[in-house]
Curated annotation (Swiss-Prot):
Subcellular location(s) per record: Cytoplasm, Cytoskeleton, Flagellum axoneme
Similarity comment: family membership: Belongs to the tektin family.
Disruption phenotype: Male mice are fertile but show lower fraction of motile sperm cells due to a significant proportion of cells with deformed flagella.
Keyword set, alphabetical order: Cell projection, Cilium, Coiled coil, Cytoplasm, Cytoskeleton, Flagellum, Repeat, Ubl conjugation
Name this protein carries in UniProt: Tektin-5
Organism encoding this protein: Mus musculus
Amino acid sequence: MEFLGTTQTASFCGPKKGCGLQALPPAGQEPVVQECYQPFHLPGYRYLNAWRPSVFHKIATSQTIPEECSGIRRPPTILPSLRSALFCRYTPRDWDRSNDLQIRNAEASRLWASRLTGDSLRIMQDKDQLIHQMQEGTSRNLGQRLSDLGFWKSELCYELDRLLTENSSMDTLKRRLECAAEEVNCPLQVALECLYNREKRIGIDLVHDNVEKNLIREVDLLKCCQDQMRKLAKRIDFQIRDNRDAQHSLERDIEDKSSAQYIDENCFNLRSTSDSISFFHGVEKFDGTVSIPETWAKFSNDNIRHAQNMRANSIRLREEAEHLFETLSDQMWKQFTNTNLAFNARISEETDVKNKLQTQLAKILQEIFQAENTIMLLERAIVAKEYPLKMAQTMLACRTRRPNVELCRDVPQFRLVNEVFTIDDTLQTLKLRLRETQDTLQLLVMTKSRLEHELAIKANTLCIDKDKCMSMRKSFPSTPRLTGYTCSAIGSGPYANHAPRISSGPCSGSALCKGPASCGGGASCGGGASCGGHAPCGSALCSHSVSRSGPGFAPVC
């Protein structure tokens, strides 16, 4: 039954679409005769606006009744106040359906609660097992970490002990070098000629390399044995500083590892029942680490390698000093050997660079060939694309002569315009790529020219070092021990710090050289010089007048 003033949210006020029920009646209940309930509406009633006055909104609508309910007589259209009885709101079937629905909902809720309880118990067991496994894994990882810490700490301590021993040896050697003073003399004519030839190098190859340093060291007679010892002592002092720096790095690393080992041991011994545990909220969100296991191990390994390199350098310096302490001939042979080794290394470097330049030149030539082919293909492609553009533009031009309304912007017109724009854009792209390829070709040509120039420079340098210098140095005395001059006066007096001046030509002054050959700094001054004839001719202690000759390398006595 329909009441005035009720809203459409009530379940008994809505229209029912059908009378047939899909659900079967409960067991043991007599079948109920199907009936169709159609709510009664007063004239002027609006279904969606039941709260509005119906007298202002009269709509001529017809109540649609399903076919199965067409046999049911519609209640007479009378006012509710004139009715003798009211219609019931629900049917017995609705009541049974509601009860069944409540029972099913209760059963579903019970099943859901039972399932949720089982799942919760299973989740708790799984999480307990997971946490236990994670704790075991963490303890195992901490144990492995402690093992790694112990290993690296022992390695660092071992290397530190060896480095301390090496530092002590270096300090002793430094004191020995500061007290030693010897002078050596070696033949210089070959080294001077090598320097003169190496001045003919061109461009960037005119570099002050290791060969140049060794040759100058030979020309200057290593200045003097005392300066040589002082330089070596200075190098040893620098090496001692490097060793101490490596020592401090090892000590700092050992100290850090000791602290980390103490902390990790405390963490390893913690248990869930320990008294020292507490909450630290947000600690897992803050990542204050500065390394990973690989970089952590590499840091200690680098410190050990650095200390080993420092010890190796110290050993080389001590060996060099021990050789320097032997004899003048040994020192001269060593210098000659070092110079030859520097020559061989430099020749190897020059050959390697020359081969690399030749390889690059071959690649550049190949790229030039490819660039030229690309330019040719691009030009052909541009020419080939011009014909479709001409055809499309011709078709557009012809279509512009259509009369009157036939001049329509139809699909062919759009396609032709699009085709023209596309082909034109393609042509612009190809032309741009053509210009870029041409620029690249110019760059490749310039690179080819530079490489050819560099190859010429390298060939000239290789010819000087290998064919001229090394061929002359083959005639250098090969005996490991050569006699020389030792002057006890060198190292004291006003000429102690002066570089020796070596002759490169025949004697032309008043000095009496012992022989017709070039003085070369190896002949003794036999004239009335202040040195008394004991100093090398042309040296700092020789008082004879000198004159410049040659390319400016050394004076002539």
